[in-house]
């Protein structure tokens, strides 16, 4: 799914609430991201649309806060704590996710399995 500025976005989303884990001075989320408007979208292994510059989950740490919350590799992050993530750079996304003042991160994500389930139900 790609986003065209100024056009409405239609997506099946899932809420994921991650409680950061404190390790010393750090707050750990337990996942990594890839993508962003400043990255080469043709390198994105999670989207069939090779123009999609979204932010995707590329790694989830086993037993970490993100896995416990239900985040999955390949999830596309649409929002973080109410902030639109559809047209951000990789660094902007990283900073939004790791904001020190926020111990809970509320995500809206979309994933291929959700999209396919809705499409299947519409065909039935």
Swiss-Prot record:
Record GO cellular component, one term: actin cytoskeleton
Molecular function via GO: beta-catenin binding
Modified residues (Phosphoserine): 61
Cleaved signal peptide residues: none
Keyword Transcription regulation attributed: no
SUPFAM superfamilies per UniProt: PDZ domain-like
Modified residues (N-acetylserine): 2
Tissues of expression: Ubiquitous. Detected in brain, heart, kidney, lung, small intestine and skeletal muscle. Detected in various cell lines including HeLa. Weakly expressed in peripheral blood leukocytes.
Principal location class: cytoplasm
UniProt key word Acetylation: yes
SMART domains: PDZ
Disulfide bonds: none
Keywords in alphabetical order: Acetylation, Cell membrane, Cytoplasm, Membrane, Nucleus, Phosphoprotein, Wnt signaling pathway
Topology in membrane: Peripheral membrane protein
InterPro entries: PDZ, PDZ_sf, Synaptic_Scaffolding_LAP-MAGUK, Tax1-binding_p3
Annotated compartments: Cytoplasm; Nucleus; Cell membrane
GO process terms (BP): negative regulation of cell population proliferation; negative regulation of protein localization to cell surface; negative regulation of Wnt signaling pathway; regulation of Cdc42 protein signal transduction; Rho protein signal transduction; Wnt signaling pathway
Record domain PDZ: where: 15-112
Family matches, as PANTHER family: DISCS LARGE, PDZ DOMAIN-CONTAINING PROTEIN
Function per UniProt: May regulate a number of protein-protein interactions by competing for PDZ domain binding sites. Binds CTNNB1 and may thereby act as an inhibitor of the Wnt signaling pathway. Competes with LIN7A for KCNJ4 binding, and thereby promotes KCNJ4 internalization. May play a role in the Rho signaling pathway. May play a role in activation of CDC42 by the viral protein HPV16 E6.
SUBUNIT field: Interacts (via its PDZ domain) with GLS2. Interacts (via its PDZ domain) with RTKN (via the C-terminal region); this interaction facilitates Rho-mediated activation of the FOS serum response element (SRE). Interacts (via its PDZ domain) with CTNNB1; this interaction inhibits the transcriptional activity of CTNNB1. Interacts with HTLV-1 TAX protein. Interacts (via PDZ domain) with ARHGEF16. Interacts (via PDZ domain) with KCNJ4 (via C-terminus). Competes with LIN7A for KCNJ4 binding. Interacts with ADGRB2.
Identification of the protein by name: Tax1-binding protein 3
